[in-house]
Amino acid sequence: AHYQQVKLLEQDIIPDLSGDKKHETITANIASNADSLATWLIPAIGDVCHEYNLAVNFRLADENRTINYLKDGEVFGALSTHAQALPGCTLEKLGDMQYLLVASPGFISRYFPQGINVQALATAPAVAYDQKDDMHIKYIERIFGLKGGAYPCHTVRSSEAFVNFAKHGIAYCLIPKLQIQAELASGELINLLPEHTIVRALYWHHWVLLKGVFKAYSNAIILRAQHALSNQ
């Protein structure tokens, strides 16, 4: 991991020494959850990409597992739910991601005409990001006592697809409130269980020693995330 830090910091120093930061390509690797990438993360790097010739590589994983990329030295920063910093790293709390269980009016009429209950859930299709995504499973089990495998569940590795699955009446699912504010306001999507909102604290973990484009990138992520997550 230390070797990777040195190599990445070297490529940040070279453009400064040459005075040609606009033309030297700098590669920045970060680990992110799909929901952050689909909402606030891309705008966060816009100003940095305009200032530097930046090639960004995203390592996508569940927010519980992104920290492993930082631990292995594959990235200089990671968006994670872990509240404790790794050795040689520091962290900033960005805010809380709120997740709502939503469905379209048509889906509700078809599967939940008498409300959401165990009997209705047994036939209503849900959706998960991948086989390791257990947020929905834990949520339904905690509230209704229904275990994973006791109901149909689609799998799709795309946060944007979650929204489309819900809007087109294909599934009900947990989606970040930040991602569907317009759909909630218009009634295109309905919050099924307002009293059971999931709140997940999100942290930005990064190397302690950052300079140049990496420091600018880190600062942009912190500012954009804190602003977005405070306006849900």
Per-region residue spans from a language model:
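Paired acidic/hydrophobic, glycine-rich loop segments that form the ligand-binding mouth/hinge
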Residues: 76-80, 171-175, 192
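Immediate post-signal peptide segment of exported/extracytoplasmic ligand-binding proteins
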Residues: 18-28, 119-123
